[in-house]
Amino acid sequence: MLSSYRHQKKYKKNKAREIGPQLPLWAWKETAFSINQEPYWYSTIRLQGLMWNKRGHKLMFVKENQGYEYWETSGKQWKMEIRRDLDLIAQINFRNAWQYKSQGEWKTIGVWYESPGDYKGKENQFWFHWRIALCSCNKTRWDIREFMIGKHRWDLCKSCIQGEIVKNTNPRSLQRLALLHLAKDHVFQVMPLWRARRVTVQKFPWCRSPMGYTIPWSLQECWEMESIFE
């Protein structure tokens, strides 16, 4: 008996898909008002369709060179470069083996401190960018000038908007502060904390803070954040 299973769908590879019409924020608010919904109605519905565990970007192995394994995230717009020291991985002290590239320099992530102190914000830069790098929001065609006149990117979650602002402006600048205020009331989409920890390689640094995943980053923290991009 022949199997009844057939490949009924032919998937087109490398097909550029535009997600919805590009409309300014006021147009979505008027649409929501006309059907008796909240102003952020469409943003919420659209962003809920981004399944983190299926559509989110992942960490991929690149190469092994001079005692290091090099990895990078699969997203093209927000590509993070990470490496780990194979010599340290083979030892008990594997927690300090991971590094990420920031402004052309390698910084250690996942450090375990043996003496008491205030280490709360030591890893904020990595986890801030890591959350955005994993998110499946399409971060192309970002234009600060259009954003300032009200053409909000409705298909970006609040974390990705904050990330684009940090990437394109200087820390503690008036321009960044103004843009962050514009994005202050944008819809925040929760990303499960396990998503930050789910990678294809063992002994990856453990995310210890819910900031950016279940709790949005504050305006002050984004204003002071250093971008990893040159």
UniProtKB/Swiss-Prot annotation:
It comes from Maedi visna virus (strain KV1772) (MVV). It comes from the Viruses. GO terms for cellular component: host cell cytoplasm; virion component. The keyword Chloroplast does not apply. The gene is vif. Signal peptide: none annotated. It is found in: Host cytoplasm; Virion. Its main location: host cell. The keyword Ribonucleoprotein does not apply. Belongs to the ovine/caprine lentivirus group Vif protein family. Keywords: Host cytoplasm, Virion. This is Virion infectivity factor.
